[in-house]
Amino acid sequence: MTAPAVVKPPDRPPRQAKISYGGQAVLEGVMMRGRTWMAVAVRAPDKSIVVTSQPLPMRLYGGIVQKIPLVRGMTMLWDALGLGMKALMFSADIQMADQTEEEVKPAADAKPSVVASLSKPLAWTTVAVAMIFGVGVFFVTPLAIVGFAEQFVPANSLWSNLAEGLIRLVLLVGYVALIGLMPDVKRVYAYHGAEHMTIHALEHNDPLDPAHVSQYPPAHPRCGTAFLLEVVAISVVLFALLGTPDLWIRILSRVLLIPVIAGIAYELLRLGGKYPDSPFMKVIVAPGLLLQALTTRYPDESQMEVAIASMEELLKREGESPQPLVASTAA
């Protein structure tokens, strides 16, 4: 399915939102994250839309943390691992279709909606396993391969780090491409596209309905996919500055510098969202948009409805209006 061209109504100004909304696709659903709340909407096996929401931990999303460059980049890791895994576990529960009344209780103020606990020990265990897997595959493995090659080729800071970065990039692209061949993951990628398109519609002050959401592309410059690609690029530069010490020191440095790299990547992502028309930032975000061709699919109408339901729940919790803002006229 191909996205139609965007047609902007002339009588609606761009929404000057104070919040940069983000999100993540889950199993048959979408998680949306705002300034103080997160919301999840999932298409249940009976075709109803199930939604839930919870406040964000303000020690991470508010106060001084969000004002410190580099340090606030850690919230992106929390998004991808902490919040994302909670939302994923919630969506998996819904798909199991064996919920009891004690586990799922209808909400009084939402259409087919539930309030469920998003905090489970299993989620944290899964986060830990995911972190170990990610660090092992995408940081330690490329270094181990380069370290093995250095037994036959003299070590050189430039080529060693370039080779390590190239291997890391190949692993990343190969991973997202291969899992994208799985039917279930294809649907997750379609919900990923629906998430982006809904955010586009909100940011362009269009009504949140499938007719308007469908006009937008499934790629978005603030996507976490772009974040991952920036992590790879920044790691090449940063690790090159460290030279080629003993292999165990390099492995330790890769692990310890992950928060620093994430912080730098997050700042670039913020700049890309703040200055989308800047020629320099267009060059910076372009590779991430290209990579999203692998991690997004154009959704069908039912998938857009789920993304819209998630955004509407979030806007309600954030005290924002889901309706387009109307341009004021001088008297």
Language-model region placement:
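Hydrophobic alpha-helical segments characteristic of transmembrane helices
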Residues: 98-182
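Divalent-cation
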Residues: 1-109
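Membrane interface segments of multi-pass transport proteins and intramembrane proteases
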Residues: 111-116, 146-163, 242-252, 271-282, ...
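Short, charged, low-complexity patches
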Residues: 63-74, 78, 257, 261, ...
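Juxtamembrane "helix exit" motif at the C-terminal ends of alpha-helical transmembrane segments
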Residues: 90-94, 130-155, 231-255, 259-262, ...
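Hydrophobic alpha-helical membrane-embedded segments
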Residues: 36-37, 68-90, 164-189, 261-274
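Polar-ligand-bearing catalytic/cofactor-coordination segments
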Residues: 2-26, 30-32, 46, 58, ...
